[in-house]
Regions:
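Flexible "stalk/tail and boundary" regions
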Residues: 5-11, 15-61, 66, 75-119
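Active-site beta-strand/loop microenvironment that shapes enzyme catalytic pockets
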Residues: 72
C-alpha cells in the first residue's frame, strides 16, 4: 500500500470485491458504516440477501505488515485478475486496487464519461 494511504488505514482494514473488477480496501470505520447501510436494506428481497451474502463471503480483514503490505486472498486476486502490476488509488471512502491492465482499459470509458457528465 503506498505510504500516503497507510496512515488513513490504520492497523487493520477490510478487503472486498469492488465494482469493475477491482478490490476495495476500507478502513474498519468505513467498513462499519457500510455494514450499517446494508442493515437498512430490505432483507426480504432475495437479490439484496444474495448481494450481502456474496459481499461478506468474499471480504477479508487484513493487517498491514511493517512494510505496508497486505496479503490479498486468492479469491480476490482472481476476481480482480491481478497477477503482476498494480494500480492503487484513493477513491473517497476507500482505496481501490486494480490490475494495471484492466485499469488502463477503462481510460477511454473515463474520457467519454467526463464528456457525458459535462466535466
Amino acid at each position: 500500500i503506498p505510504e500516503k494511504y497507510r496512515n488513513q488505514l490504520g492497523g487493520e482494514s477490510v478487503l472486498s470485491r469492488g465494482y469493475d473488477r477491482c478490490i476495495y480496501i476500507y478502513t474498519m470505520e468505513d467498513w462499519g458504516l457500510l455494514v450499517e447501510k446494508l442493515k437498512e436494506l430490505r432483507q426480504s428481497d432475495p437479490a439484496i440477501r444474495e448481494f450481502i451474502r456474496k459481499l461478506f463471503s468474499q471480504a477479508s480483514e487484513c493487517k498491514l505488515d511493517s512494510q505496508g503490505r497486505v496479503i490479498v486472498p486468492a479469491n480476490l486476486k482472481s476476481y480482480a485478475r491481478i497477477d503482476k502490476d498494480l494500480v492503487t488509488l484513493g477513491a473517497m471512502d476507500k482505496i481501490e486496487v486494480w490490475s494495471k491492465e484492466i485499469f488502463n482499459e477503462n481510460d477511454e470509458d473515463f474520457i467519454a464519461k467526463l464528456a457525458e457528465y459535462g466535466l
